[in-house]
Every structure is written in C-alpha cells, then in structure tokens.
From Swiss-Prot:
<comment type="similarity">
    <text>Belongs to the ATPase alpha/beta chains family.</text>
</comment>
<keyword id="KW-0472">Membrane</keyword>
<comment type="function">
    <text>Produces ATP from ADP in the presence of a proton gradient across the membrane. The catalytic sites are hosted primarily by the beta subunits.</text>
</comment>
<dbReference type="InterPro" id="IPR036121">
    <property type="entry name" value="ATPase_F1/V1/A1_a/bsu_N_sf"/>
</dbReference>
<dbReference type="Pfam" id="PF22919">
    <property type="entry name" value="ATP-synt_VA_C"/>
</dbReference>
<keyword id="KW-1278">Translocase</keyword>
<dbReference type="GO" id="GO:0045121">
    <property type="term" value="C:membrane raft"/>
</dbReference>
<dbReference type="GO" id="GO:0005886">
    <property type="term" value="C:plasma membrane"/>
</dbReference>
<dbReference type="Pfam" id="PF02874">
    <property type="entry name" value="ATP-synt_ab_N"/>
</dbReference>
<dbReference type="GO" id="GO:0016887">
    <property type="term" value="F:ATP hydrolysis activity"/>
</dbReference>
<dbReference type="Pfam" id="PF00006">
    <property type="entry name" value="ATP-synt_ab"/>
</dbReference>
<dbReference type="InterPro" id="IPR003593">
    <property type="entry name" value="AAA+_ATPase"/>
</dbReference>
<dbReference type="InterPro" id="IPR004100">
    <property type="entry name" value="ATPase_F1/V1/A1_a/bsu_N"/>
</dbReference>
<dbReference type="InterPro" id="IPR005722">
    <property type="entry name" value="ATP_synth_F1_bsu"/>
</dbReference>
<dbReference type="GO" id="GO:0005524">
    <property type="term" value="F:ATP binding"/>
</dbReference>
<dbReference type="InterPro" id="IPR000194">
    <property type="entry name" value="ATPase_F1/V1/A1_a/bsu_nucl-bd"/>
</dbReference>
<keyword id="KW-0375">Hydrogen ion transport</keyword>
Length: 473
C-alpha cells in the first residue's frame, strides 16, 4: 500500500504528501488511523477522499469526518480504491453513514458483505429502457394529476409540517406492499432529530424491513454531506442492476447536496460562480441525477425533497435541479388547514407523464377536466367571499358544487397513519381512481353530501359513508 504523511490540515481539508511519486488517484480513499494513547483520549480513524493533485507529490483531500486530533506528520495510507459501501439485502432495515458503517444499535454488517464503490458511471445508452411506464402509487391525487414515471425523478416541495415525511412513508409502504419493492432513504444534511424520528416511525409502521437508510447529518463535515447521496444511490443501484428491482430512492434534501458541494469547492480554492455556488454545480448534479434511471433490468425512481432558498425559484441550486425533474408534487399548507390529506396542491403539481400517449385518452381527459373544474372554483372563490354563493349563476354554482366534492375526494387515509387516525388506510388502483372522478364529473353523485367524499378511498366507500350518514342513495 502507498503511504504518505499529513503535510497540512485546513479544517475539513487535509493535504497528504506521498513519497517516490506514488500518488493515489482522484476519488481514492485514504485512511488515517491512530489508537488512543490513554483511556482519556479518543483514537483517530479518519477516511479522506482525494480531490486534487497539487504537484510536488502532494494531494489535497476532503475529510469524511471531523479532523480533530489530526497533526502534521501523521501516517496516511492509500487504500487504492474509492470509498466502498455494503450493498444487497444486508442493508435492509439498517442505518448507515457515508462510509457504509452502520450507525444503528445492531450488530455491525458482516465483514464479508459485498461492497460497491460510490463513484460509478451512469448506465450507457444501450442499457437504458426506452419504455415509459407509470409507477402506480395508490395515492389518488398523485396517480390522477401528477403521475410518477418508473425511473423518473420527482421533486417534493413543501414547508415544515405539511406532510412530506408522511407522504414519503406512505410511498415506501405502498411500493413495499403492492409491488414488493425496496426503498433507500438518503438524509442529506438532515436534522439528526428528523432522521431519528423517521427511523422509529418507520419501525412502528412496519416498513423498515424493506428500507435501507443512509444519513449525513447537518453537524457533519461538508465532505460527508456531499457524498452521502452517492452512498444511498450505490445501494439503490445494486437492487436495480443485480436483483432487477423497481427501487424508490428518497433524497432529503437535495439542496443540502448542492450546499455541501459549494462548501467543498470553496475549501479547495475554486473560483465561485453565480450567487457564490461552485463552478461545477451542473456537473455534480448531472453526475448524481444521470445514475437515477430505468434500465432493461429494473428502475431507480427518485423522490427528492427540495428546499428553495428564500422562495427564489431562479436560485442556481433549485434551478439546476428542476432541469432533471419529470414531475413535481407540491404540498400546500392551506389544504392541511382544511383537513385535506395528503395536502397535495392539484393545480401546482405537474408531470410530463400526464399525456394521452402515456396514460391513455380517458385518464388524460378526466385529469384535465378535474383541473379545469378546480381552476374555475379557485377563480370564483373571491366572488363567493365578497358576494356569497347566491350571486353565482346556475352553471357556476354547479362548478363549485362538484369542485368541492372533487377536492375532498382527492384526500384519503394513509396506512402509515392508521395508529394516529384510527382509520384504515386505502390503496386505490389508477383505473378505479379515474372511474371515480369520471362519475363525479358526470354528476352521478351530486346528491350526496360533501362530507361523504372526505378521507375515503374508492368511490364505493363514498356511497357507503353517505348511507351511514342517513342519506338516501
């Protein structure tokens, strides 16, 4: 193994000098290990990643953990390969850090477990699937108005407390239960508390055994936060390429990936670009996003929570992410206040899959009519607020009447929330979703009360609920 010595420490950046021209390659992992000298001291076990060749037999590296205690002259060993992490079934139900070390309270992953390097090429053109296939989620508002594509990338927008985590959990649950699929969750620059809560909530709801979790928390150095998304993606790729699975890959939050890259870029001395971001922003984002795709064997479908700095959608970080997205799911606080869950905004959410050649003519026509009805209702709300319903024409009254039923019917109970609500969760196939809304638009259920449509699954449940309310059906 090639050995070198630490020549300079600049916070999370460490320069290492190697002898006799034995320079490690870019992205190679370098280890610095030193046992504790006494009981009161903590030993050093640090992994670095080579970022630059500076010349004079010296490389500049980024630390994957704190550099506390690292001194000039310490021995550093080139491992001869990039950071490699465990892949396969051993990762399910477990929590890892950026290096693939388990950080849950269970036994360490077996030493002989298969490992893959986190830096890999995106699938070549001949490996890519040319078919556009819809990923059925069982969530009505998503499947009808902003359907997800297998191997696609979805942006999940929403503030604090509007239900991003519950939506993520329900998607993990539905993919596991209905499709037998696997999920990988990457917490990038996450609050440790949120990651901890998510792990225990998923354990309680029973979906953890179909999920691998990787965390690079907010308090960790930028190197760890920048690479943790690649660690999660490497685990997801194995399930796709080796096991032929349709994998869900969650990134929360993709903005933190960019933010960490910006910090690393500044530490490496690169000239900043627009708004202080790294000049390699588009390249780094592309390298990550291009690996998320459908192949002839399986697919990795990514759902990415996106923080928008100061609500400025022209900021380079979110703007670069948008270029890669196939669909957006926007969560709206006003809907949570109305008791509509999931609080997905049916007018702001979009998908390029909502086209007649992909979803079919009937689905497309119903979805567009639902949107136009809700849009007209939105336009009429100001008039209703000022003058009241009585001032509307008969046609507009009918629009409002149906729009409110549609709005309530877009809600449903979630399986993962059963323990809180006491209501059984529902999974609604796309065909039944389309049929239900088609019948509402045709006026078949105009005589039923609005509350019968709230938090139900199939349209038959609306009729049952109305009967329970004492309404003649």
């Amino acid at each position: 193994m090639k050995k070198g010595r630490v020549s300079q420490v600049l916070g999370p950046v460490v320069d290492v000098r190697f002898e006799d021209g034995h320079l490690p390659e870019i992205y190679n992992a370098i280890k610095i290990s030193q046992p504790a000298a006494s009981e009161n001291e903590v030993g050093i076990d640090l992994t670095l990643e080579v970022a630059l060749h500076l010349g004079d037999d010296t490389v500049r590296t980024i630390a994957m953990a704190s550099t506390d205690g690292v001194q000039r002259g310490m021995e550093a060993v080139d491992t001869g390969a990039p950071i490699s992490v465990p892949v396969g079934d051993v990762t399910l139900g477990r929590v890892f850090n950026v290096l693939g070390e388990n950080i849950d309270l269970n036994e360490p992953v077996p030493a002989d477990a298969k490992k893959d390097p986190i830096h890999r090429q995106a699938p070549s053109f001949d490996q890519l699937s040319t078919e556009v296939e819809i990923l059925e989620t069982g969530i009505k508002v998503v499947d009808l108005l902003a359907p997800y594509i297998k191997g696609g990338k979805i942006g999940l927008f929403g503030g604090a407390g509007v239900g991003k985590t519950v939506l993520i959990q329900e998607l993990i649950n539905n993919i596991a239960q209905e499709h037998g699929g696997i999920s990988v969750f990457a917490g990038v620059g996450e609050r440790t508390r949120e990651g901890n809560d998510l792990f225990y909530e998923m354990s309680d709801s029973g979906v953890i055994n179909k999920t691998a979790m990787v965390f690079g928390q907010m308090n960790e150095p930028p190197g760890a936060r920048m690479r943790v998304a690649l660690t999660g993606l490497t685990m997801a790729e194995h399930f796709r390429d080796v096991q032929g699975q349709d994998v869900l890959f969650f990134i929360d939050n993709i903005f933190r990936f960019t933010q960490a890259g910006s910090e690393v870029s500044a530490l490496l001395g690169r000239m900043p670009s627009a708004v202080g971001y790294q000049p390699t922003l588009a390249t780094e984002m592309g390298q990550l996003q291009e690996r998320i795709t459908s192949t002839n064997v399986g697919s990795v479908t990514s759902i990415q929570a996106i923080y928008v700095p100061a609500d400025d959608y022209t900021d380079p970080a979110p703007a670069t992410t948008f270029a890669h997205l196939d669909a957006t799911t926007n969560l709206e606080r006003k809907l949570t206040e109305m008791g509509i869950y999931p609080a997905v905004d049916p007018l702001a959410s979009t998908s390029r899959a909502l086209a007649p050649e992909i979803v079919g003519e009937e689905h497309y026509a119903v979805a567009r009519e639902v949107q136009s009805t809700l849009q007209r209702y939105k336009e009429l709300q100001d008039i209703i607020a000022i003058l009241g319903m009585d001032e509307l024409g008969e046609e507009d009254k009918l629009v409002v009447h149906r729009a409110r039923r549609i709005q309530f019917f877009l809600s449903q109970n979630f399986h993962v929330a059963e323990q809180f609500t006491g209501q059984k969760g529902s999974y609604v196939p796309v065909k039944e979703t389309v049929q239900g809304f088609k019948e509402i638009l045709a006026g078949k259920y105009d005589h039923l009360p609005e509350d019968a449509f709230r938090l139900v699954g199939r349209i038959e449940e609306v009729v049952e609920k109305a009967k329970e309310m004492g309404v003649e059906v």
